[in-house]
Curated annotation (Swiss-Prot):
Disulfide bonds join C132-C160, C284-C297. InterPro entries: Collagen, Fibrinogen-like_C, Fibrinogen_a/b/g_C_1, Fibrinogen_a/b/g_C_dom, Fibrinogen_C-term_domain, Fibrinogen_CS. Initiates complement activation and/or interferes in platelet aggregation and/or blood coagulation. Residues 95-115 have a biased composition (Basic and acidic residues). It comes from Cerberus rynchops. Expressed by the venom duct. GO terms for biological process: complement activation, lectin pathway. This is Ryncolin-2. Keywords: Complement system impairing toxin, Disulfide bond, Hemostasis impairing toxin, Hydroxylation, Secreted, Signal, Toxin. Belongs to the ficolin lectin family. Veficolin subfamily. Residues 57-114 form the Collagen-like domain. SMART domains: FBG.
Length: 347
């Protein structure tokens, strides 16, 4: 029921009651007292008012907040959040201590082939310089290391003796102080080894290239520990390639001051401690601690051990049989080549 309908009903009931009260008022005095004496007698005069609930009242004012309760237990840990953005780089810290040296890296790739010339006054590239004699003819008069071109594709750095016997000699072996070990293997003699400022072996592959075209004279110079110098010169010298085991071809003995102890090695192959090519049942290179064109075994052993003069061991020093024999090792020895000349000056 709508509120207005309930109100209208109450109004009608009230009006009816008011009429009855008025009727009672018009009665006489005898009506002033109720005529019923018991509840049962008055039942018919009762009026019972019934109606619909009234309109709800306005909500009251909110009450005061209660006191704070006890702190609850921590809840379970939440899932990790997403990574934030990188912050602004901070200021660089102080420089740390120097670290230890790292491990050696892998070997790099082979570089491009460069200019082999090592002197400030290298000859022009259009000048053909095949050997030390060519350098001498182009005005180079000082002993030292030069670049030559035995072939255009094979530049080579070599030591040139520009003083001895007219100069123009290319030195391929030198002994002078024992600073380099000459008791080495086949591969070492193939490629060459030593130090430019002291002792060296140029390398059998290079010696073969240098002696494979044109006739090369050979000169061997020796000096003992008493300062006495001697030499031997040969009309020609060459060696074969590795397939030929660097076989020696040496010409006639021209002249010298220490007699010949080398031509007996002619026609023999080169031997080292790990490559026995001699005609002996044993390994001559191992027995006499060198590398040479041994047969059964040697008359010269210029790549033997470096002793200071006389030695007790038999024939394993820098020996020259027709010179000071098998028990004396020379202080200095070198072997050098030069293109054959029609006239030579001996010194």
């Amino acid at each position: 029921m709508k509120p207005w309908a309930a109100f209208h009903l109450i109004f009608l009931v009230a009006s009816s009651l008011e009429g009855e009260v008025s009727n009672y008022g018009t009665r006489g005095a005898q009506d002033t007292e109720p005529t019923c004496r018991t509840e049962h007698q008055c039942t018919r005069d009762k009026i019972i008012l019934q109606s619909q609930p009234g309109i709800p009242g306005i909500p009251g004012v909110p009450g005061i907040n209660g006191s704070e309760g006890l702190k609850g237990d921590p809840g379970p840990q939440g899932l990790p959040g997403e990574t934030g953005f990188d912050g602004i780089p901070g200021v660089a810290g102080p420089k740390g201590d120097k670290g230890d040296q790292g491990d050696k890296g892998d070997k790099g790739d082979k570089g491009d082939k460069g200019d082999a010339c090592i002197l400030d006054d290298c000859p022009p590239t259009d000048v053909e310089v095949r050997n030390c004699q060519d350098l001498l003819e182009h005005g180079e008069i000082l002993n030292g290391w030069y670049t030559i071109y035995p072939t255009k594709e094979n530049p080579m750095v070599v030591f040139c003796d520009m003083e001895t016997d007219g100069g123009g000699w290319l030195v391929f072996q030198r002994r002078q102080d024992g600073s380099v070990d000459f008791y080495l293997d086949w591969e070492s003699y193939k490629k060459g080894f030593g130090k430019q400022e002291s002792e060296f072996w140029l390398g059998n592959d290079k010696i073969h290239l240098l002696t494979s075209s044109g006739t090369q004279q050979l000169r061997i110079d020796l000096e003992d520990f008493e300062g006495s110098r001697t030499f031997a010169k040969y009309s020609s010298f060459s060696i074969g390639d590795e397939n030929e085991k660097y076989r020696l071809i040496v010409g006639s003995y021209l002249d010298g001051s220490m007699n010949d102890s080398f031509r007996i090695h002619n026609g023999h192959s080169f031997s080292t401690k790990d490559r026995d090519n001699d005609t002996n049942k044993g390994n001559c290179a191992m027995m006499y601690k060198g590398a040479w064109w041994y047969f059964h075994c040697h008359h010269a052993n210029l790549n033997g051990l470096y002793y200071k003069g006389k030695h007790a061991n038999y024939a394993d020093g820098i020996n020259w049989r027709s010179g000071k024999g098998y028990y004396y090792s020379y202080k200095y020895a070198d072997m050098k080549i030069r293109p054959q000349q029609s006239e030579t000056t001996v010194s």
